């Protein structure tokens, strides 16, 4: 075992039939932690079902099914290694809640890999007004995903095959769109690939000898190393709370910022419940401290399971503890709402792990979403494609933070009619001081 590689998270985005599953499956298959025996059994099963063409996507389908069926979240299956990084694929797209997951995502992606269908008609469908290519790229940028890699996929099926002119045409059009969204297209590699045949995924392909840039694997290796927010105060949104016989109450979640360690006195927002952390575990091993990105369970003393809920946030009681938000102001982009959104609108907000109805109390301004310039003060409504600053009031106690200070707790999806109608980033929060919150004996001793 050499030195542990740096971990990065990747989100794979793009239109429905662009080949996301095949490309992701291929990487995991060739570079990943899937046991060869497992793959052979998949291959056999795929062949029996005449799904040979689907081999790589099939890998992902099997993994998805296993992930949905079992409670064991074997994240190792979603990993692959480059020379420099250990990469985790955060969410396998194609999921109905993909956009919601991307926002509340258990994690901030370090890089978005945008898969484009280069075939005749395929590219046009993806980039059209209704296609998801634009929406996903805009989302990635709004949510602070710094790096973007574009894969011009299905190069084996262009007319003629492996067509340079088709590649050039796509690069030109996608670059101009990415520029509108906010990315610098000169910093975005465009890699012509075939996720199915394997061209330029890992090794250079002689079919594409006109292309001199990096392969997909090399492009991933060239991502700048991300900075991790371990210096910030602790924020750990709870995903679940378990009662474990002989141990007690164990909240589970992902450290978003800061560190958590045994002996620390934590305060849970929004209620202000304060207690001592007895132990911290990851993958059944005790930790001396857990860092941002770690999915952990931690044991707390004298706290009933009913006192903690999904969406609560653990924080260090001595370092900017988490508090309930009385109201907050956010920059919101309306993505797919059939009508007009005006003051009083009360959809559900998905922010980190919480899922709470929030009232749009006051639409303060309408802005140009690219430049941020104000277009109109106190507009009557916002509609599709509009962006604006909105003051919001939660209908139940919830914890949110500014995007600038705690990014994962400062971005949200607005859900209505079973879809994501808008996304937002929080600019300012007015907090409530907790009243009458329970402080356990263990925590008092520590004071």
From Swiss-Prot:
Taken from the UniProt entry, a GO cellular component term is: cytoplasm
What Pfam families does its record include? GTP-eEF1A_C, GTP_EFTU, GTP_EFTU_D2
Q: What is its main location?
A: cytoplasm
Keywords assigned by UniProt, alphabetized: Cytoplasm, Elongation factor, GTP-binding, Methylation, Nucleotide-binding, Phosphoprotein, Protein biosynthesis
Q: Name one GO molecular function term.
A: GTPase activity
Among its keywords, does the record have Lipid metabolism? Answer: no
Outline the segment boundaries, as ranges, of region: G3. 91-94
Q: Which residues bind GTP?
A: 14-21, 91-95, 153-156
The subcellular location is: Cytoplasm
Instruction: State the family named in the UniProt similarity comment for this chain.
Output: Belongs to the TRAFAC class translation factor GTPase superfamily. Classic translation factor GTPase family. EF-Tu/EF-1A subfamily.
Q: Which HAMAP family match?
A: EF_Tu_A (MF_00118_A)
Its biological function? This protein promotes the GTP-dependent binding of aminoacyl-tRNA to the A-site of ribosomes during protein biosynthesis.
Name of the molecule in the record: Elongation factor 1-alpha
Task: Name the species this protein comes from.
Answer: Hordeum vulgare (Barley)
